[in-house]
């Protein structure tokens, strides 16, 4: 259902089960981002989590229109919309401001993904509703809910993933032959983190910014204790 390089439609981004086999592209991006980080910024943030924080890279929300939809009619009359039922059960629509993608289902349920804040997601959802209303549907916009907030950050030091998984086995999944990142499932807040040896961290599953930031605050000392240089000197 997703296109190459489009993580916004993957089960990971939508808040589903994390499958490392589907995340190899994300691992490559994380590695490239880390290599572009300067040594000066790495030293500045070390030992001080306040210098770094998760940046929201995607908000996934859902809402209802309260009416059955004819998806072929919608894609015929709307711009930037497509529908291929052999590939995916819903129609896909995109708008540029705020930049986002909507997955539109016959039931009237819509998934909005790709925005960088909850407020942007609300604005985008109402724009999609307005587009469908103009096509001729007597919509009733309701039940806007944030399903998943995805954040990304860089702790600016390398991490010994094997040591980390040995210390926190109950929370970790690590299959380096399949995927270079470690999957850490935090119990409270209920957030899943992808941790890379480069220091890149992706957080998913949060329903609000407070949970996203708290998850990072909780994981930072664990990552610092498993800093690769510190482990090698013991």
UniProtKB/Swiss-Prot annotation:
Domain of life according to the entry: Eukaryota
Pfam name, any one: TBP
MF term (GO), any: RNA polymerase II general transcription initiation factor activity
Any single GO BP term: transcription by RNA polymerase II
Compartmental location: Nucleus
Sequence repeat residue numbers: 52-136, 142-223
Listed HAMAP family: TATA_bind_prot_arch
Listed name of the protein: TATA-box-binding protein 1
Organism of provenance: Entamoeba histolytica (strain ATCC 30459 / HM-1:IMSS / ABRM)
Gene that specifies this protein: TBP
């Amino acid at each position: 259902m997703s296109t190459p390089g489009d993580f916004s439609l993957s089960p990971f981004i939508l808040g589903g089960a994390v499958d490392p086999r589907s995340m190899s592209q994300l691992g490559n991006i994380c590695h490239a981002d880390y290599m572009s980080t300067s040594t000066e910024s790495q030293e500045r943030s070390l030992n001080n989590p306040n210098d770094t924080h998760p940046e929201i890279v995607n908000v996934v929300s859902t809402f209802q229109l309260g009416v059955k939809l004819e998806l072929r009619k919608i894609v015929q009359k709307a711009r930037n919309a497509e529908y291929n039922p052999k590939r995916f059960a819903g129609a896909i629509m995109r708008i540029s401001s705020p930049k986002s993608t909507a997955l539109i289902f016959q039931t009237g349920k819509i998934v909005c993904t790709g925005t960088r804040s909850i407020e942007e997601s609300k604005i985008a959802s109402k724009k999609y509703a307005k587009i469908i209303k103009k096509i001729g549907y007597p919509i009733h916009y309701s039940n806007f809910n944030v399903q998943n907030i995805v954040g990304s950050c860089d702790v600016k030091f390398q991490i010994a993933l094997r040591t980390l998984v040995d210390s926190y086995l109950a929370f970790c999944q690590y299959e380096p032959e399949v995927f270079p990142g470690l999957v850490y499932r935090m119990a409270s807040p209920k957030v899943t983190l992808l941790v890379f040896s480069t220091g890149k961290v992706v957080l998913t599953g949060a329903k609000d910014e407070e949970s996203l930031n708290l998850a990072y605050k909780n994981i930072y000392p664990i990552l610092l204790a498993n800093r690769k240089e510190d482990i090698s000197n013991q």
